[in-house]
Amino acid sequence: MEQDNGTIQAPGLPPTTCVYREDFKRLLLTPVYSVVLVVGLPLNICVIAQICASRRTLTRSAVYTLNLALADLMYACSLPLLIYNYARGDHWPFGDLACRFVRFLFYANLHGSILFLTCISFQRYLGICHPLASWHKRGGRRAAWVVCGVVWLAVTAQCLPTAVFAATGIQRNRTVCYDLSPPILSTRYLPYGMALTVIGFLLPFIALLACYCRMARRLCRQDGPAGPVAQERRSKAARMAVVVAAVFAISFLPFHITKTAYLAVRSTPGVSCPVLETFAAAYKGTRPFASVNSVLDPILFYFTQQKFRRQPHDLLQRLTAKWQRQRV
């Protein structure tokens, strides 16, 4: 809910509109979204360009990472509208269709990132815990592209109702763009919002934790293969586990906890406006964490992929050497 509202609360019903003091959104969301745009846009473009340049040697993890970067790029391209909106004191001048599209992109990126990170983690789990099994190697990159197609279809199906519930409205003689739904639809939105959290976050999160618990047990076993190659493999898997867990903890967990609490409170009859405002502020205050995911994902890519991490350094060395030769 993205607005300072009027002051109507029917007895025995959830508060439909309350006066919110939300100056913090202009002070918090505008600079955070600006940083995500300025940093995340070029980073994700670089990730996409590097993966496409290496398309002949793509691994399945790289295919998932490419789709992850595409989701982040689409979201970053929608940020200028939100930055303008919050910089003008939460006034939305772009129309109802743009409002619905921007809200859809946010949640599509959010849940797409969760699912693609889960795919990357599961791929890592198979390589560590079932390295000799052939059943998961069939199909190669083609199978990975099929999985990505299924993920995109699932994300679209999950998040499409967001574009239905999101809408513009008039508050205090200005047009606003509701994030979840107009206040009058709060009880109708609740089942969908809870289902989206369970299916789009909780279940993938549990699957990811299960994968990494199994991987940790396997990597800590003393009877595993020895040698520098095996040690590097263990180290790489450990880095991936720590970084992905950090991404989930920073980007997704606070947002979904506060969102779930806010959805429950705003649909509860008899809740006072000050209480609702407190939960709304907590929810909206964690939204930047979810947006920063578009910056953390490409950093995760460079942190865990040594081959791609060397490419910018090698390119810089070649350009420097060429520039020095031209000076001679």
UniProtKB/Swiss-Prot annotation:
The chain crosses the membrane at residues 28-48, 63-83, 102-122, 145-165, 195-215, 237-257, 281-303. Gene3D superfamilies: Rhodopsin 7-helix transmembrane proteins. It comes from the Eukaryota. PROSITE patterns: G_PROTEIN_RECEP_F1_2. One of its GO terms (cellular component) is plasma membrane. It holds the Pfam family 7tm_1. It is found in: Cell membrane. Residues 49-62, 123-144, 216-236, 304-328 are cytoplasmic. GO terms for biological process: cellular response to prostaglandin E stimulus; cellular response to purine-containing compound; cellular response to pyrimidine ribonucleotide; positive regulation of ERK1 and ERK2 cascade; positive regulation of inositol trisphosphate biosynthetic process; positive regulation of vascular associated smooth muscle cell proliferation; transepithelial chloride transport. Receptor for extracellular UTP > ADP = 2-methylthio-ATP > ADP-beta-S > ATP = ATP-gamma-S. The activity of this receptor is mediated by G proteins which activate a phosphatidylinositol-calcium second messenger system. Functionally coupled to phospholipase C. This is P2Y purinoceptor 6. It comes from Mus musculus.
